[in-house]
Curated annotation (Swiss-Prot):
GO function terms (MF aspect): ATP binding; metal ion binding; methionine-tRNA ligase activity; tRNA binding
HAMAP family noted in UniProt: Met_tRNA_synth_type1 (MF_00098)
Entries under InterPro entries matching the protein: aa-tRNA-synth_I_CS, Anticodon_Met, Met-tRNA_ligase_1, Met-tRNA_synth, Methionyl/Leucyl_tRNA_Synth, MetRS_core, MetRS_Zn, NA-bd_OB-fold
Organism: Borrelia recurrentis (strain A1)
tRNA-binding domain span: 562-667
Protein name: Methionine--tRNA ligase
Alphabetic keyword roster: Aminoacyl-tRNA synthetase, ATP-binding, Cytoplasm, Ligase, Metal-binding, Nucleotide-binding, Protein biosynthesis, RNA-binding, tRNA-binding, Zinc
Cofactor note: Binds 1 zinc ion per subunit.
Binding site for Zn(2+): C143, C146, C155, C158
Catalytic activity as recorded in UniProt: tRNA(Met) + L-methionine + ATP = L-methionyl-tRNA(Met) + AMP + diphosphate
Summary of subunit composition and partner proteins: Homodimer.
Motif residue range(s): 'KMSKS' region: 330-334
Length: 726
């Protein structure tokens, strides 16, 4: 009997917006869960938000709200981001669910009854200013192991679990004062007492097969250093109350209650939850985590299960990943560095494209740097130039010259012998949770298809040997069906689109792989993806590069930069069309004072109708390098004001000047009377480095007004008086 797969992704803290690095675990677990279902394995994928503890309490203090309101806010944000990424949880719950308290307290009482809970008086930081004991994340200081600045629970730099009062140069995060040491009582889990059972369990697991190298190293090092009693209570209000006399005013430490959340969240949707969580014989527990969570899943959570002396389903496979970082910078919402889940949605780059790149570079054995230029290169060459190209060229060619009907043929033995070996390798990589290797194997299969199409030159043989050519193409069509199945764990929407080309006449199942089943007609075809343009990527790179990276060394003086390298002009909008491949993109034909005029493409359809803009005069960056958006050439960029609330308005010249003149330049007031330069073409990065702003309704650079060259009228932003110009 085949075992069931119980899959979890580390519960994300509900005190922030997830960035790309945070998404690695939920996406990895999603791909594995989809693979598991594809193989016909009974599968349950559980995740949810981790809502209790100091991280939530401290964030609520910062946002001046209650922990409950904060959790409601960020749970909704997380849920919407994961939905956009098309992550197929069986349940995405919360540790504030109705079963969590009783589940945590029940496990604690069993540990206490079995003699695995101890009491200790210890010394803890106490803030005299705020008159409270400071739980670990209420204290910042220097890690005693590596010297990195950290909070008091775990060092993000060296991953060591910390004892809070060992921090060097500690400070209270609320008032920034130096705390004192004061005695208090806490409860501990007696890890040394569980050590023998824990080590016996670890020895039974084939770590070399089921855990990655880093997880093995970190766990073995922790065991080698000797297990110590670990505190499980905290002096907080927001948490699961401790059901023990004299401890009623304390709550459980979040590391103790959070892993139990996997169980309580499961209870929300499955009455017979024990068939998953108390069924070690028939269930594989597969957990996806970041490297900073390894010890909580290999030592702490298993110790709780073992200490309860019940038949809990124990960890089998552990898929821990390294960090995904950003352009050699640290993800920081406040500093504006890195791209976060809500930012990704606004890029208008499809979710499957993001999924592809994250899996392609999944940090399985080493940290990985997200780089915009590499993102563009991989998408354009691998996803589009290889994978999408095969599907488009084969289906359109077959449909054009051989019609819609797909004949059932005997498959070419030599071709499929090679391909089936690749299928076996792909499935094995999935099974071992080597997701990056699985994806690259799929891309290799696609390359084989492209090479055969290119080498056999069906465009030359379609008339001379039509049947042979048709059979060649049919073999490739069955290969495309298989690719749509294999790629589905990584790019489910793309898989569905390919299946729709065939009327969804087959299921996402490994049973179809390498067969001549499931295909009857080609109902439709379309291009799956469009290339990422450099202008878009450059603008996104700049947007998320952080305040300190907005200018390069050559152009620190934004006034000189504008005068010497930027040309703004007034233009009249003559016509507006919508891009047939992208409804949100307007194609604007402009009168710029020249006989040929100008054309720009702009994503403003969400903000304006055609009728509001036709006939109006606007200002454009006239010397921007031409670029293509969804295949349409754009020869400039209109300018607009955006404020801190993301309100957006185009600069309309009629707001401050009657009878504007198409082609009139916009200059700095300080350049009046000077000979103006005709600057060379520039990138959008260069324009943004000028840092034009709206101040009290007037456009300025470093306090100097922008004006129309001939009329000397000041350029105004009437509807949004204060903001940045983009």
């Amino acid at each position: 009997m085949q075992k069931k797969n119980l899959i979890t992704a580390a519960l994300p803290y509900v005190n922030n917006i997830p960035h790309l690095g945070n998404l690695v675990q939920v996406l990895s677990a999603d791909a594995f869960a989809r693979y598991s279902r594809m193989m016909g394995i009974e599968t349950l994928y559980v995740c949810g938000t981790d809502e209790y503890g100091t991280a939530t309490e401290t964030k609520a203090l910062i946002e001046k709200t209650t922990p409950e309101e904060l959790c409601n806010k960020y749970h909704a944000i997380h849920k919407s981001i994961y939905e956009w990424f098309n992550i197929k949880f069986d349940i995405f719950g919360r540790t504030t669910n109705k079963y969590h308290k009783e589940t945590v307290q029940d496990l604690f009482l069993k540990l206490d009854k079995n003699g695995y809970i101890t009491e200790k008086e210890n010394e803890q930081f106490f803030c005299q200013q705020d008159q409270m004991f400071l739980a670990d994340r209420y204290v910042t200081g220097e890690c005693p192991n590596c010297g990195n600045n950290t909070k008091g629970d775990q060092c993000e730099n060296c991953s060591n679990l910390l004892v809070t009062n060992e921090l060097l140069n500690p400070r209270c995060i609320i008032c920034k004062n130096i705390p004192i040491i004061k005695k208090t009582k806490h409860l501990y889990i007696d890890l040394p007492k569980i050590k023998n059972e824990l080590e016996h369990w670890i020895q039974q697991i084939d770590q070399n097969t089921n855990w990655n190298i880093n997880a093995i190293k970190i766990t073995n090092a922790f065991l080698r250093d000797g297990l110590k009693e670990r505190t499980i209570t905290r002096d907080l209000k927001w948490g699961i109350p401790v059901p023990k006399k004299e401890y009623e005013n304390k709550v459980f430490y979040v590391w103790f209650d959070a892993p139990i959340g996997y169980i309580s969240i499961t209870k929300e949707i499955i009455k017979d939850w024990e068939s998953w969580w108390k069924n070690n014989e028939d269930t594989n527990l597969i957990q996806f985590i970041g490297k900073d969570n390894i010890l909580f899943h290999t030592i702490m959570f298993p110790s709780i299960e073992l200490g309860s002396q019940e038949n809990w389903t124990m960890l089998n496979k552990l898929a821990s990943s390294e960090y995904l970082n950003y352009e050699n910078l640290k993800f920081s919402k406040s500093a504006g560095t890195g791209i976060f889940g809500n930012d990704v949605i606004t890029t208008e780059i499809p979710s499957d494209v993001w999924r592809f790149y994250i899996y392609y570079n999944r940090p399985e054995k080493a940290d990985f740097q997200f780089m915009w230029d590499d993102f563009m290169e991989r998408i354009n060459s691998e996803l589009i130039g290889n994978f999408s190209n095969l599907i488009n060229r084969v289906l359109t060619f077959y449909k054009k010259f051989f019609g819609d009907k797909i004949d059932k043929i005997e498959l070419n033995e030599n071709f499929w012998q090679i391909v089936n070996i690749k299928y076996e390798r792909t499935i094995n990589f999935f099974k071992q949770i080597e997701l990056k290797a699985a994806l690259k194997e799929i891309l290799d299969i696609s390359r084989i298809g492209n090479k055969i199409f290119q080498d056999k030159e069906p465009w030359k043989t379609k008339n001379s040997t039509p049947q042979t050519t048709k059979e060649l193409l049919l073999n490739l069509i069955y290969l495309i069906r298989d690719l749509s199945i294999l790629i589905s764990p990584f790019m489910p929407h793309t898989s569905d689109r390919i299946r729709s080309f065939f009327g969804k006449s087959y299921e996402i199942s490994n049973k179809f792989l390498g067969t001549n089943l499931g295909l009857t007609t080609i109902q439709s075809t379309e291009v799956l993806f469009t290339k990422l343009e450099k202008q878009l990527i450059d603008s996104l790179k700049l947007k998320y590069s952080g305040r300190t990276n907005m200018q390069d060394e050559k152009n620190k003086n934004s006034i000189n930069l504008f005068s010497e390298q930027i040309c703004l002009k007034t233009v009249k909008i003559k016509t507006i069309d919508r891009n047939p491949d992208a409804e949100k993109l307007f194609i604007l034909k402009l009168d710029d004072g020249t006989p040929e005029g100008k054309q720009i493409v702009s994503s403003i359809a969400d903000h304006y109708t055609e009728e509001e803009l036709i006939g109006k005069h606007i200002i454009i960056v006239d010397n921007l390098k031409p670029a293509k958006f969804r295949g349409i050439r754009s020869e400039g960029m209109l300018i607009a004001t955006k404020d801190e609330n993301k309100n957006f308005k185009i600069i309309i010249v009629e707001d401050f000047k009657d009878n504007p003149i198409p082609g009139e330049r916009v200059i700095l007031e300080s350049d009046t009377g000077k000979e103006l330069k005709s600057p060379t073409k520039i990138s959008i990065d260069k324009f943004l480095q000028a840092q034009i702003v709206a101040e009290n309704g007037e456009l300025k650079i470093n306090g100097i007004n922008l004006i129309l060259e001939h009329s000397k009228e000041k350029v105004l932003s009437k509807e949004i008086p204060n903001g940045k110009i983009y």
